Regions:
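Proline-aspartate-enriched helix->loop->beta-strand connector
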Residues: 92-98, 231-232
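C-terminal segment of N-terminal export signals and the immediately downstream linker at the start
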Residues: 1, 22-36
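His/Asp/Glu-enriched short active-site or ligand-binding loop at hydrolase and phosphoryl-transfer sites
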Residues: 56, 193-217
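A short, structured surface patch at a secondary-structure boundary
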Residues: 33, 39-87
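Extracytoplasmic substrate-binding proteins
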Residues: 113-182, 209, 275, 279-297
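Short helix-initiation/N-cap motifs at beta->coil->alpha
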Residues: 77-85, 213-223
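N-terminal export signals
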Residues: 6-26
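Structured C-terminal subdomain patch of bacterial secreted/periplasmic proteins
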Residues: 33, 131-134, 229-297
Length: 297
């Protein structure tokens, strides 16, 4: 069982001042040794120019998270649901950044290192993009970073939202952000409460899926539930390891091929996007959506 001492950081963490923008350089000596289990927290660190010494599932992170780029020096400590405690201990981190969900999956993390909690994406009653900002600010506070640094990251993201909003302003399509199952028969739709929905709102675009969702804002639906989305654009989340099989399954699915957006060529794949990311992921998604819709014109 976790104690307050285990989950709250002690004093004396080195300050990481003098940073600005996405991924600014910071002297290694001035940064704490941090292992990030939560990817949104890792993304936040990198946007401050702080490189974690360890991260959960580095290979998959690089497939899903475009920028800031994760350096090759970062040690993989295993998947978030089964952290390699020996690898974690060997890194001798000042602390580990995780969510309460991570601790449920691997509670013994706290036996190895001090743990600092960041908000989970399932935090209730918080708008999803605002939650991303809260994660950014929390990570900055943990790392001793000046509040002006996360503010500059948010400002940079807002500029990208504005540019993307201008690009898509001439498009009248509702947008469906979706993840197909590998068999191509069902879609996970990202509805209210998800990062894709928050970004669509930032871009003044309607979300195709306004139906019921689960606690994380997603809904698993059959293709027949997308028939009425005639005037829409479908943006498909790319999982690299599944892409070929998924495309093959969709191409062989008659219902998919009969959907109006598919027939009219209004389908694009979203590369290197992780729907559980933070502010940098939101800005990246805005760029992807703008590019996809512009190419459909």
């Amino acid at each position: 069982m976790l104690t307050r001492r285990q989950i709250i950081l002690g004093s004396g963490l080195a300050l990481c001042a003098g940073l600005s923008g996405f991924g600014s350089a910071v002297a290694a000596a001035s940064a704490p040794r941090v292992v990030a289990i939560d990817w949104a927290a890792a993304e936040a660190m990198l946007s401050f120019g702080i490189v974690p010494v360890g991260l959960s599932d580095t290979s998959f992170y690089r497939q899903r998270m475009a920028a800031p780029v994760l350096p090759e020096t970062v040690v993989d400590v295993g998947p978030f649901w089964e952290i390699n405690l020996e690898a974690l201990a060997a890194l001798k981190p000042d602390f580990v950044i995780a969510t309460d969900y991570n601790l449920v999956m691997t509670p013994r993390i706290a036996d190895v290192a001090r743990v600092a909690l960041v908000p989970s994406i399932t935090t209730p009653n918080v708008e999803r993009y605002q939650l991303a900002i809260e994660i950014l600010n929390r990570v900055a506070n943990l790392c001793g970073v000046s509040p002006s640094v996360p503010s500059s990251v948010v400002e940079a993201a807002e500029r990208r939202f504005a540019k993307a909003r201008e690009t898509v302003s001439k498009h009248k399509y509702a947008v469906g952000v979706m993840l197909p199952d590998i068999g191509g028969r069902e879609m996970t739709m990202y509805g209210e409460g998800t990062l894709p929905d928050a970004v669509l709102r930032k871009l003044a675009l309607s979300n195709v899926w306004s139906g019921p969702v689960n606690g994380t804002g997603m809904a698993r639906v059959g293709l027949d539930q997308l028939v009425e989305s005639a005037d829409a654009a479908f943006l498909v989340v790319d999982i690299p390891s599944q892409r070929l099989q998924t495309e093959r399954s969709l191409q062989q699915n008659t219902m998919w091929k009969l959907l109006r957006p598919v027939r009219d060529g209004r389908v694009a794949w979203l590369n290197q996007f992780h729907p559980f990311g933070g502010v940098p992921s939101a800005a990246h998604l805005a760029d992807l959506i703008a590019s996809a819709l512009e190419n459909m014109a």
